[in-house]
UniProtKB/Swiss-Prot annotation:
UniProt-recorded name of the protein: 2-dehydropantoate 2-reductase
EC number: 1.1.1.169
Catalytic reaction annotation: (R)-pantoate + NAD(+) = 2-dehydropantoate + NADH + H(+); (R)-pantoate + NADP(+) = 2-dehydropantoate + NADPH + H(+)
PANTHER family reported in the protein's UniProt record: 2-DEHYDROPANTOATE 2-REDUCTASE (PTHR21708:SF26), PROBABLE 2-DEHYDROPANTOATE 2-REDUCTASE (PTHR21708)
Taxonomic placement: Archaea, Methanobacteriati, Methanobacteriota, Stenosarchaea group, Halobacteria
Metabolic or biological pathway: Cofactor biosynthesis; coenzyme A biosynthesis
GO cellular component: cytoplasm
Protein's organism: Halobacterium salinarum (strain ATCC 700922 / JCM 11081 / NRC-1)
Gene Ontology biological process: coenzyme A biosynthetic process; pantothenate biosynthetic process
Signal sequence annotation: none
Active site: 185 (proton donor)
Pfam families registered for this protein in UniProt: ApbA, ApbA_C
Keyword vocabulary terms for this entry: Coenzyme A biosynthesis, Cytoplasm, NAD, NADP, Oxidoreductase
Binding site for substrate: 185, 189, 193, 203, 252-255
Main location: cytoplasm
Length: 303
């Protein structure tokens, strides 16, 4: 299987390293950067949770035309870049499956505007990752990964993608309800990301002290009501799942914390903002989520 990972940030680099470690032919596609230069010259170093390091050697590309020969494109760009990434895929893809492993709501729908909807796969993962220096990504904690078709029934092609991830060490299951999985991942992110970014703490702080526990629980509980109003029946244990993810990735910096600390744009609009927008459609009050969203916007001076 020939795989292109579009967006070699923290998660994209981890995914590329996992797939390349399973002997899949992998290309990291991104803008020219010191990170890609280092990967091209020295390989991609994946630091495992136990401290050991695995070096893999994915190819590197900056020209989007590389996706023309791919069997699978894994989209890991930030959610605010989905539209531009989708347009590039629409011009270059030739029958490849397109898997979104992004944060937030609505990414698959945007991709399906530019590539055939029956080629779009919706994925979620709770694996933690952090790019610590050029050419190096730290696998900050294990998790669950699921994939499923955006439109239509799952088939052998979907199973082959799951097998490639599992072979590389990221155990992946196929689900018939990918949108439910997306919502549950969004709710976990809503419970963890903004709070850790604003308080400048690792994920584990949210389950180690009462204030963190309260914010996580209230935010996720608000989000559950919105998901149900949208017709998505999420697991009753999603609050506990958020706690488990925070505990399992206790030493990890959430992506929003990394972005805010580095002066980069966050994905608050596709996470907290998207939930607030849908809550407004159903006249549901989400004061904690709304406040978290506004505080992140204030911190990044955006809107």
């Amino acid at each position: 299987m020939r795989v292109v990972v579009q967006g070699p940030g923290s998660l994209g680099s981890l995914v590329g390293g996992v797939l390349a470690g399973g002997e899949t032919a992998v290309t990291l596609l991104g803008h020219q950067s010191e990170h890609l230069t280092r990967v091209r010259e020295d390989g991609l170093r994946v630091v495992q949770p136990d401290g050991t390091t695995r070096v893999t050697r994915p190819s590197v590309a900056t020209d989007p035309s590389v996706v023309a020969d791919a069997d699978l494109v894994v989209v890991c760009v930030k959610s605010y870049d989905t539209a531009s990434a989708a347009r590039a895929l629409g011009r270059q893809c030739d029958g490849a499956m397109v898997l979104t492993l992004q944060n937030g709501l609505g990414n698959a729908a945007v991709l399906a505007e530019h590539v055939p909807a029956d080629t779009v796969l919706v994925g979620t993962t709770t694996h933690g990752a952090a790019r610590t220096e050029p050419g190096v990504v730290r696998h900050a904690g294990g998790g669950e990964t699921t994939i499923g078709r955006y439109r239509g029934a799952n088939d052998a092609r979907v199973a082959s993608v799951a097998a490639a991830f599992s072979t590389g060490g990221m155990e992946t299951t196929v689900t018939a309800s990918p949108q439910r999985a997306v919502w549950e991942k969004v709710l976990v992110n809503v419970g963890i990301n903004a709070a850790t970014a604003l308080a400048d703490v690792d994920n584990g702080a949210l389950v180690e002290c009462p204030p963190g526990e309260r914010v996580l629980e209230r935010a996720v509980t608000e989000g559950v009501r919105v998901a149900e109003a949208e017709g998505v029946s999420v697991s009753e244990s999603v609050v506990e799942r958020a706690r488990q993810v925070a505990a399992r990735t206790a030493s990890n910096e959430s992506s929003m914390r990394q972005d805010l600390a580095g002066g980069a744009r966050t994905e608050v609009e596709s996470l907290h903002g998207a939930v607030v927008e849908r809550a407004r459609d159903h006249d549901i009050a989400v004061p904690v989520i709304r406040t978290l969203a506004d505080l992140v916007r204030l911190a990044q001076r955006d809107g």
